[in-house]
Amino acid sequence: PYFAPPRVERSEEGTWSLDARADRLYATMSEVVRQHLVADVPVGLLLSGGLDSSVVAALARRHGPVRTLSMGFADSGLDERPFGRAVSEHLGTDHEEIVIRPEEIVGSVEEAAWYVDDLFGDWGVVTTMLLYRKCRDAGVKVVLVGEGSDEVFGGYPDFASAGGAE
């Protein structure tokens, strides 16, 4: 194969109690978030109000003031702003809401295709490009997100059937 990840042997961590594992996870995540907040440019956090981004925002808030941004689509049911706003109010973050209009999406397809340099059938490419541009325009140069926990913790149904998850 082109690439095969190295096999990791079980360590003594495999015998830790659930509480010890939870403590280790919390300490590790908190430290990683703290490290990613260190920058010489403004840092923001995309806050959907879901579990992933809310956990990252809560951990970041423990280290000081946090700027959060939530996205919504004009005239659409796909609007994360109310959920992000609720979490922001609970955590006391400096919050901004970003709206993406349908005409912005349609008008940006060609540009997004140029950046991707490939055919794509996922509108998320266009909206993600617009979202990050609006973050930049709002003065946020570094953006933390809450993506990845489903992959790490087996949050997708397909992962449960993959086997090996304990």
Give the label of every model feature segment.
Residues 1-5:
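Non-catalytic substrate-recognition/targeting regions of SAM-dependent transferases
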Residues 6-166:
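ATP-dependent adenylate-handling active sites, centered on carboxylate activation for C-N bond formation
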